């Protein structure tokens, strides 16, 4: 059974936090060479706190993918770490989430789920499902140009709000991710083009997909 679900930072076990922060170090420091702080082989920062909720994709008790949500009324990476990258950032008041630290461990995904399973798109859809379930109005995030391309290809009707430059002089984008019924249906339909999944299963929260179906 592949499961994607939410866990608040206050409820995160020491074992799972260690696994998560180790995978984040391997992704953001070792592979992407981002300017992140690492301690004892793990990557975590001041935004990993009691205001944080994580989405986990787990199969056989193994973390495959994850991301971090913080309500925009709290300190977050858009208004903190990434703020100097942009000439102007204006996040509207409202019931919005900030998303960061999105990753998929490609080697784990391949070994456990196979090559045909659309895990990135599944995590995108889970962001919508979670937001709708909890009553949020949308998601803001900062992405690189390659990640922007992946988001556009997913079928999600995203909107670029601002463009900036990172510390490495690379383009980065402040993006709004809508969480309405139309975008939920668009992502679910694209994921299920082969008819592998039950359509109603894809729109549930938490998201649970039987392993036999996931590997079909």
Curated annotation (Swiss-Prot):
Gene (name only): carI
Organism: Pectobacterium carotovorum subsp. carotovorum
Protein name per the record: Acyl-homoserine-lactone synthase
Molecular function GO labels: N-acyl homoserine lactone synthase activity
Enzyme class, broadest EC rank: transferase
This enzyme's EC code(s): 2.3.1.184
Keywords: Antibiotic biosynthesis, Autoinducer synthesis, Quorum sensing, S-adenosyl-L-methionine, Transferase
Top-level division of the source organism's lineage: Bacteria
Job description of the protein: Required for the synthesis of OHHL (N-(3-oxohexanoyl)-L-homoserine lactone), an autoinducer molecule which binds to CarR and thus acts in the control of the biosynthesis of carbapenem antibiotics.
Name of a matching Pfam family: Autoind_synth
Reactions catalysed, as given in the entry: a fatty acyl-[ACP] + S-adenosyl-L-methionine = an N-acyl-L-homoserine lactone + S-methyl-5'-thioadenosine + holo-[ACP] + H(+)
One GO term of the biological process aspect: quorum sensing
InterPro entries: Acyl_CoA_acyltransferase, Autoind_synth_CS, Autoind_synthase
Family label: Belongs to the autoinducer synthase family.
């Amino acid at each position: 059974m592949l499961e994607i679900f939410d866990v608040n930072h206050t409820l995160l076990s020491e074992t799972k936090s260690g696994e998560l922060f180790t995978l984040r170090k391997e992704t953001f420091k070792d592979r992407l060479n981002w300017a992140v702080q690492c301690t004892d082989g793990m990557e975590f920062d001041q935004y990993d706190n009691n205001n944080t909720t994580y989405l986990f994709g787990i199969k056989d008790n193994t973390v495959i993918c994850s991301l971090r949500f913080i309500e925009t009324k709290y300190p977050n990476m858009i208004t903190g770490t990434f703020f100097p990258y942009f000439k102007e950032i204006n996040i509207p008041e409202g019931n919005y989430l900030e998303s960061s630290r999105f990753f998929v461990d490609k080697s784990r995904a391949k070994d456990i789920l196979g090559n045909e399973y659309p895990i990135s798109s599944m995590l995108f859809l889970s962001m919508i499902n979670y937001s709708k379930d909890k009553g949020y109005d949308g998601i803001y995030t900062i992405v690189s140009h390659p990640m922007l391309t992946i988001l556009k290809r997913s079928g999600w009707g995203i909107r670029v709000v601002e463009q900036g430059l990172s510390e490495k002089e690379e383009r980065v984008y402040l993006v709004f991710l809508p969480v309405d019924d139309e975008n939920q249906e668009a992502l679910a339909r694209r994921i299920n083009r082969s008819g592998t999944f039950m359509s109603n299963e894809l729109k549930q929260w938490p998201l649970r997909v039987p392993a036999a179906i996931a590997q079909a």
